[in-house]
Amino acid sequence: MPVTAHSAHVAHAVRLDRAGGPETLALSEVAVAEPGAGEIRIRHHAIGINYIDVYHRSGAYPLPAPFGIGVEAAGVVEAVGEGVSHLRVGDRAAYVSQPPGAYATLRVMPAKCVVKLPDAIGFDEGAAMMLKGFTTQYLLRRTLPQGGLAAGDFVLFHAAAGGVGLIACQWARALGLQLIGTASTDEKCAAAKAHGAAFTINYARDDFAARVREITGGKGVKVVYDGVGRDTWDKSLDCLQPFGLMASYGSASGKVPPFDLGVLGAKGSLFLTRPTVFTHIATRESTQVMADELFAMVTSGQVKIPVEHRYALTDAAQAHADLEARKTVGGSVLVP
């Protein structure tokens, strides 16, 4: 039998009957079962908001209806199923996982996805850092060009004032990398600079490919980390050194259209990858390794998690509207 701290288990959760705009986000009451073997039940104190939530809501990443959204949160473990040894009732915990369903007051989920949250890290930070922090970790530490990256190397990071971008600016600075960050306004460029970007480019005003060549003395960068997609794709390839790596990890502006692979050869024998966080956290061991490194960066003060926007769970629609309108800087969370 699971160890439990509560007997009544009803959650308020965002459930969608169909894909669509922010107006489809509505709260409903759902029954929450006891955790089975290998599962835990967690009561959320904060829920991270990410662009993947928009993809799920809009149908860009289709899910069978009815469905929930949200892939990261932080809270307190309420119940532990059979066979779970790394978590106990009362533990502060955080996670990023599939399937979606974090937009809820509590939920049951696989324990392998959940890690203990250090006392030095608040719930808002924990909820805002898991997907974005794990993404930064696998990009800067695992998604590397031939020979890896060394202090002084140039990399280009699009949307550098976003949730992932502001973490990446800080992490890159700690690694000694020369991160060139792009953003859509001067204010966002200033935010990226303040968080550690060596150089910034307002891509709404300047030709970012030309500026990258200027900054690097014509050499280009070793890696482009691109979560924007369609709008930045072509010029991003022009920013790379020969044998450089194009890491396309998102498509905020839309999917990259089909293209001729011969372009990669013509532009310098380039490498291309489309990584996802869920490949990297497929096992509990890998998840814990990533969490340990992320938490160490945060508790040491080398990376601070900017949580600039807090919304009530009932205001999830407004949170999505603001995110899609690019009105947010840094991380955003929902509070149950």
Where are the language model's segments positioned?
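NAD(P)H dinucleotide-binding glycine-rich loop of Rossmann-like/cofactor-binding domains
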Residues: 95-159, 171
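Glycine-rich beta-strand-centered segment in the early N-terminal region that forms part
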Residues: 7, 31-48, 58-101
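C-terminal hydrophobic helical "lid"/dimerization subdomain
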Residues: 2-9, 284-336
